[in-house]
A protein has these predicted regions:
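Second-shell loop/turn segments in exported
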Residues: 20, 44-52, 77-85, 147-158, ...
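Sec/Tat-exported extracytoplasmic proteins
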Residues: 17, 34, 64-72, 96-106, ...
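Active-site-adjacent mobile loop/cap segments within catalytic or ligand-binding domains
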Residues: 9, 33-35, 122-149, 178-231
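Short beta-strand-plus-loop segments that form exposed binding edges in beta-rich domains
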Residues: 13-24
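Stable alpha-helical elements in mature extracytoplasmic
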Residues: 26, 53, 57, 61, ...
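Active-site-adjacent substrate-binding region
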Residues: 156-188, 196
């Protein structure tokens, strides 16, 4: 995506071959971020298709996979009639498509990209409100009661519970160490696409409540974001 030159001396990219090692430095293009959305879709009840006008990171997974060249059958499971449902399902299906053919998602009947992806996590924020400065905190969701309770390798889907439990424990430990207090909420075995469809251990992480003031103080703290991401 092109941008205008000469706006700022700091807004530039420099390539140099000054190094203690022999070799070559080349760059056909330089990209900042994911670019702008360019997938045309019609809103419900309309025939006219248009692009969102938003950066791609603010769009859904369905549109990213479309742009990235993922097969239509992976990102569209509702015949193009329900982008909301497609977006939810595309996350797990897209992950399986990338990993299929690797040691973690072995499959001889469906094509895949063979990328060795070991885990899948859907990072969310939850709703919920307190009338004081209490923290609502972090919740984990996993799914065990589908696909014969097994993952692609034959491993029990209880591995997803272990994954979710470890994730919540680490976030709780690290944020409590930094803040002095953090709330670890429940682990739920529930039927959600993002925790059901991936054929590797997977979970949905509800990091905090986007509706609660005390949680959002943490959400807007760059160091807390780092702690959560590291955990």
């Amino acid at each position: 995506y092109e941008f205008n030159k000469g706006q700022s001396l700091d807004g530039s990219v420099s390539l140099t071959n000054h190094s203690s090692h022999r070799g070559h430095v080349t760059a056909d293009a330089v990209r900042f971020g994911g670019g702008m959305g360019n997938i045309e879709r019609a809103e419900a009840g309309e025939e006219y298709q248009k692009i969102s006008g938003l950066p791609r990171y603010l769009e859904g997974a369905r549109y990213y996979m479309h742009w990235a060249g993922v097969p239509y059958s992976i990102y569209s499971t509702k015949d193009g009639e329900n982008d909301y449902a497609d977006d939810i399902n595309a996350r797990g299906h897209g992950m399986n498509h990338m990993a299929r053919g690797s040691d973690f998602v072995p499959n001889d009947t469906m094509p895949g990209l063979g990328v060795p992806l070991e885990l899948a996590i859907g990072v969310h924020t939850d709703a919920g409100l307190r009338n004081n400065m209490d923290i609502i905190g972090t919740l984990g969701v996993y799914t065990t009661q589908y696909y014969d309770k097994q993952l692609a390798t034959g491993m029990s889907r209880l591995a997803s519970r272990d994954f979710a439990d470890g994730m919540l424990a680490q976030i709780h430990k690290d944020l409590t160490l930094h803040l002095g207090n953090w709330t670890r909420r429940s682990l739920f075995d529930r039927n959600y696409s993002e925790s059901r469809e991936p054929q590797v251990p997977s979970m949905i992480l509800e990091v905090l409540s986007h509706q609660n003031y005390a949680d959002m103080l943490v959400a807007h703290d760059p160091y807390c974001k780092f702690i959560i991401a590291r955990a």
